[in-house]
Amino acid sequence: PFGERSPAPIASHSSRRALELSERLAARGAKMYGAWWCSHCAGQKETLGAEAMGEGGFYVECSPDGAGAENERCVAAGVKGYPTWEVGGQLFPGEKDLSELDEMLSSAK
């Protein structure tokens, strides 16, 4: 629909490690809250790659003018900035490299 904005397509392909992390994130019901205009969100998506992001199903668009926006969900979760990961009800703000995503999964309840 008119007025909805989408993030840039993800250019990178997922490494084996990124795909494994994506499976673990999905199994834990993880969510990545972000916005179409957020450069760090784009960086986070590139770190995981197109396949991991596409299969994971954990991206939540928080910008009200973004395609498929779920702004109310972001507000309800208490998201203050982007990107913010949610795992086990805990929020983990900021862009993460693969090692940090692994640590996040290990430390989440």
Label each PLM-derived region with a short phrase:
Residues 31-34, 58-60, 84-86, 91:
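Structural recognition of the beta-strand scaffold that forms the well-ordered cores
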Residues 44-47, 68, 80:
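Secreted/processed peptides and extracellular or luminal domains of membrane proteins
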Residues 51, 76-80:
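Extracellular/periplasmic catalytic domains that process cell-envelope and extracellular macromolecules
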